[in-house]
Every structure is written in structure tokens, then in C-alpha cells.
Swiss-Prot record:
SUPFAM superfamilies: EF-hand (SSF47473)
InterPro entries, A to Z: EF-hand-dom_pair, EF_Hand_1_Ca_BS, EF_hand_dom, S-100_dom, S100_Ca-bd_sub
GO BP terms, alphabetized: endothelial cell migration
Keyword Aminoacyl-tRNA synthetase: no
Lipid biosynthesis is among the record's keywords: no
Keywords: Calcium, Metal-binding, Zinc
Full protein name: Protein S100-A15A
Pfam families in UniProt: S_100
PANTHER family with a match to the protein in the record: PROTEIN S100-A15A, S100 CALCIUM-BINDING PROTEIN
Residues noted as binding Ca(2+) in the record, renumbered to the chain: 66, 68, 70, 72, 77
Domain EF-hand as annotated: residue spans: 53-88
Molecular function as annotated in GO: calcium ion binding; calcium-dependent protein binding; chemoattractant activity; transition metal ion binding
Amino acid sequence: MTDTPVEESLFQIIHCFHQYAARQGDMETLSLQELQALLMDNMPRFMDSLGRKEPYYITELFQAADKNKDNQICFDEFLYILGKLVKDYHLQYHRQLCARYCAQHSLY
């Protein structure tokens, strides 16, 4: 049986984390530079569509996710970052739906 699209997406997230974590230092954690590269290489349109391309946004995400303040992001902390990004994108998705609905029904 083949993986579902969601299962494949989850596998790709895990693989991507480890691919970037292995670039320097600990293979089980991301540095700030590794996180920046991961997000900008793999989600450039996503980050741009959120209006989040400014370098300080990723730094703020890193600091908020680094719960044990070791200046590294473990996989659990990485999931916090993904959750935050998905929530932001979900809100944007609803704003776009509302804007489309309002435009179609002359509510502006």
C-alpha cells in the first residue's frame, strides 16, 4: 500500500529537518542559520505570502521555539515553529476566502 499524501508530507517534514540539521553541529538540532536556510529554501512563497520574509521574523520564531534556551531547535521545538506557520497561513486562507466572498457579493 502506498503512503497517503498526508503521510508523505509528514515523512518529507522529518527528512527535511534532518537534512538541514546535519549541515553543522548536532545532527538532531537546527541552529538559527540552519532554520533560516530550511524555511527560505523550502517555503519561499509560503513565507512571502505571509508577509514574513524579514530576517527578524525567523529569529523571533527561533527564540520563541527554543524552550530550553540552548540556542538550538530540536524536533519538538521545530514542530512548534511549523504549527505557528500553519496557523498564520490558515488565518490568511480565511481572509482570502472572506475577501473573495465580499468581492463576489459587492460587500466592499
